[in-house]
Regions:
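Catalytic-core regions of core metabolic enzymes
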Residues: 1-131
Length: 131
């Protein structure tokens, strides 16, 4: 099976399948999609912004029920109040099912924390908590 490229040239079947990319920043997600489309076939690409209605944990809880999702990639600037524990529980369940969760936490430096606060109003908290 091949996928057409914008140039019209067919692309061979991609080896990686079943990736769910869940990102708090839309620009990060678009960059990821642009770079990964040569390597993996995304199953889901979700940008959730400031998490006013639906949190990162809600998305992971939903996606963990999809057996076609085999790898989870999460970019997070900060948790909503009380959501960190729910996130950890979801990650543990997913990892316990044999599926990896790749986690990139923004805000490791003072400058990164300031950028996250101005972008999605996230209080990034201590980076060490997420390690």
């Amino acid at each position: 099976m091949t996928r057409p490229q914008p140039s019209g040239r067919p692309k061979t079947e991609l080896p990686g399948r079943g990736l769910a990319s869940v990102s708090q920043a839309g620009a990060y997600l678009v960059s990821q999609i642009s770079n990964l489309d040569r390597v993996v076939a995304l199953r889901y690409a979700i940008s959730f912004g400031n998490q006013m209605d639906v949190t990162v944990s809600d998305y992971l809880a939903y996606l963990e029920g999809d057996p076609g999702t085999r790898v989870f990639a999460v970019y997070l600037e900060g948790f909503q109040r009380g959501d960190g524990e729910r996130f950890l529980e979801a990650v543990r369940r997913i990892a316990g099912s044999g599926r990896p969760v790749l986690f990139y936490k923004a805000g490791r430096t003072r400058e990164g924390s300031a950028a996250a606060a101005s972008h999605t109003a996230s209080a990034v908290g201590d980076y060490e908590v997420c390690e």
